[in-house]
From Swiss-Prot:
UniProt organism field: Bacillus sp. (strain OxB-1)
Enzyme class: lyase
UniProt keywords, alphabetically: Heme, Iron, Lyase, Metal-binding
Cystine residue pairs: none
Name the UniProt record assigns to this protein: Phenylacetaldoxime dehydratase
Catalysed reaction equations from the record: (Z)-phenylacetaldehyde oxime = phenylacetonitrile + H2O
Function: Catalyzes the stoichiometric dehydration of Z-phenylacetaldoxime to phenylacetonitrile. Prefers the Z-form of phenylacetaldoxime over its E-isomer.
pH dependence: Optimum pH is 7.0.
Amino acid sequence: MKNMPENHNPQANAWTAEFPPEMSYVVFAQIGIQSKSLDHAAEHLGMMKKSFDLRTGPKHVDRALHQGADGYQDSIFLAYWDEPETFKSWVADPEVQKWWSGKKIDENSPIGYWSEVTTIPIDHFETLHSGENYDNGVSHFVPIKHTEVHEYWGAMRDRMPVSASSDLESPLGLQLPEPIVRESFGKRLKVTAPDNICLIRTAQNWSKCGSGERETYIGLVEPTLIKANTFLRENASETGCISSKLVYEQTHDGEIVDKSCVIGYYLSMGHLERWTHDHPTHKAIYGTFYEMLKRHDFKTELALWHEVSVLQSKDIELIYVNCHPSTGFLPFFEVTEIQEPLLKSPSVRIQ
């Protein structure tokens, strides 16, 4: 471990994914329906939910709600497969093809569709869990093991095997391009990302907290998380943060539960590290969490976990159909209009 201090002895327990030798990839697909009123999205969401039950469907799927820009909401499914071929078979199924890539959305539809599909080599992936819980992301179908590779700067990088042989820097260097407001409504767009994009899903689960701890988390810790996410979203060029969504998780029927996660993309792992190491907004999260621990005698039922991956351009497929201009990767990088026109319709888009 390149960054681990000598004689390192963590003060708290932590766990990390232990991928079986026969497993080479994780497919993580975020699939979103965007609208100012999700009542318009009911048909699409119903088709999506039904398709997840197919034999080739995901090993696990979460649902979440994101309050986005200009009053838009995103209803998002976060789906995991343990091999790319099964995912490809699922996409090819007629039940999925009914809605995949926004095929049923017309040029004036009140809804947009987007998908961000990542095919992640196992050596480009790492996880960390505060408890021995098998209900977080890939841990639904991958064992987790106790680890001492945490509680020091650089531990995230050390847990990712490929970091032993690569610095994982962006070919674009330190500076994220300035965002561009593109004409995106009524269009089917594909974004080409550069190599070594860093993806993080970092999550909080307060469902098992008692009333006092829950009140402390919501009143003290969560506001700093919201502030940090807002800063990242509004300062992309400074931080290298391409996209950061704070989402609240739901049941598959759409009921909000006591879980949230931030899903962020950075120009490189180094950009994520610099924000976590140095920026006041991240230090504030640590500070309020430590204050919560002190208030509750350093005993907590709050469950924390994250998944981090570094992605090559060929392993990211980014599609946006009839979405607002600040959705996902749209403000950055190379954008191509897919030459499969949207349906024609006399309906009027709700803006």
